[in-house]
A protein has these predicted regions:
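Surface-exposed, flexible coil segments in extracellular/virion-facing regions
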Residues: 88-93, 97-110
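Append "Rare intracellular matches occur via the same short Y/T/C beta-strand/loop motifs
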Residues: 118-126
Length: 455
């Protein structure tokens, strides 16, 4: 066994111990911590609650420091507790149990029989050590008797001149795969999220263009930018505004009727990177118009105005009826956002009125105490947890606040950073369906033109 203690030579720094060899035996394990994916579970037999164990051990190690008064170095033996890597724990040593002592196979729990409102208890055990107990509340089965809707999508691929930059193209198969994954995430097809909803929304490539002609390549409209137009965009590596202006200027070719199509523009509009991706991976606006039959306050968190319809003549910015995606992010999900991999499902959800779950400061949360008006999603400070495993503590949150207990969770949500991005929650689905029903600029699904050409 080799233990090394790092000494910070600065006189004001306190000693720091680092254990490099973590091989342990069961009798060295000091405690077991149990965490769950969430605190509520939908009892439909499909949603699953995953449990995760964290095993800690203690060892005596040599710690070296420097006396602040005498400036002399010293060494002493101290006891250190550390998180044991999973591959160092004996196989099968730690198991998760329900409240009547049944072992959870693979650490997951699903149910169709537990009554909504029931609070279940779970714990982990290894040897003679037992973890903390976790409570999971069975929630009401959500209303999911929605009529399935199909949203026709056209990708406008903005290609710069070959003399200016390397050209590019995307296959129809690639675009279909992108939309399929979005549909699967929205419809609870690829997740174990314990609170996943089923939006019953399917995205498909349009097969007819705006003139009613059969498209040679479904859902794909190529726009070859001329040398002069590309030159007019300037030499900056960030061409976000020039591209948006270009789309609006060429609206007859690049903005198809929002009552028939969802427009997505693909372009390498910037080489900048950011972990959030909200300006570098995509450019979009949330919905802004609501039909007068509905109360503007019915969908909180967005600035609304009443409008009976929304047509091409109403478009003042292309982002009112679509969004622009950076090709670099679509091709290589880590290229622009790093380990917070880009997913087309994120701007798609945002386009339909779903809000970001992250927040930067505790004091900026809304009156409901979260960031997105969806009670079954967690708000979190994304700077604290660059991982799918997170907690709800926020920058600026009072420590030990009894009204906001520390809760761990797992990120499945398409709006979470550092997430599996394979799910919408039940409450997010409810909000999305309200937007689809109430917002005229999001009514492309009401027309079958994109699939029939008007025939």
């Amino acid at each position: 066994m080799i233990f090394v203690t790092l000494l910070m030579l600065s006189s004001c720094e306190k000693e720091e111990s680092v254990i490099l060899d973590l091989n342990i035996s069961p009798d060295e394990i000091s405690r077991i911590e149990l965490r769950a994916d969430h605190k509520t579970l939908v009892p439909n037999g499909v949603c699953k609650m995953g449990f995760h164990t964290f095993v800690y051990a203690k060892k005596n190690v040599m710690s070296y420091g420097r006396d602040e008064e005498t400036r002399e170095f010293y060494g002493k033996e101290i006891e250190e507790e550390f998180l044991v890597p999973a591959d160092q724990i004996p196989d099968g040593y730690v198991k998760v149990y329900d409240q009547i002592g049944n072992v959870l196979e693979d650490g997951y729990y699903a149910t169709m029989s537990d009554v909504p409102g029931t609070v279940l208890q779970f714990y982990a055990k290894g040897g003679n050590l037992e973890s903390n107990s976790l409570e999971v509340t069975i929630r009401e089965l959500p209303k999911e008797d929605y009529e399935e809707i199909v949203i026709p999508v056209v990708f406008h691929v903005l290609v710069p001149p070959a003399t200016a930059t390397p050209s590019y193209d995307l296959s129809v198969e690639f675009l279909e795969e992108q939309l399929q994954r979005v549909s699967d995430a929205f419809n609870r097809k690829i997740t174990t999220d314990p609170n996943a909803g089923n939006a019953k929304v399917v995205f498909k490539l349009a097969t007819y263009d705006q003139n009613g002609l059969k498209m040679q390549e479904p859902g794909k409209n190529i726009e070859n930018i001329s040398v002069s137009d590309f030159t007019n965009m300037g030499t900056s590596s960030n061409k976000t505004k020039p591209y948006l202006s270009y789309i609006l200027a060429k609206w007859k070719r690049l903005i198809w009727d929002p009552n028939k199509y969802l427009n997505i523009w693909l372009a390498k509009f910037t080489t900048s990177t950011s972990t959030t991706g909200t300006s570098t991976s995509y450019q979009m606006w949330p919905p802004r118009v609501m039909h007068p039959d509905y109360d503007l306050a019915s969908i909180p968190g967005l600035d609304w105005e009443h409008k009976e319809s929304f047509n091409l003549d109403d478009v003042e910015d292309c982002r009112e009826v679509g969004f622009m995606v950076n090709l670099a992010a679509l091709y290589t999900p880590t290229a622009v956002q790093g380990s917070n991999e880009f997913s087309l499902a994120t701007p798609m959800a945002e386009y339909f009125g779903i809000l970001q779950t992250r927040c930067d400061m505790y004091k900026y949360l809304n009156e409901d105490g979260d960031s997105d008006y969806c009670p079954d999603t967690y708000s979190f400070d994304y700077g604290f947890y660059p991982s799918v495993f997170k907690a709800n503590n926020l920058d600026g949150q009072p420590e030990n606040d009894p009204t906001r207990p520390l809760e761990y969770f797992t990120s499945f949500n398409v709006m979470d950073m550092y997430s599996y991005k394979n799910s919408l929650s039940v409450d997010q689905v409810k909000r999305l369906r309200m937007v689809l029903q109430q917002c005229p600029s999001r009514w492309a699904y009401k027309s079958d033109w994109a699939f029939t050409g008007g025939n």
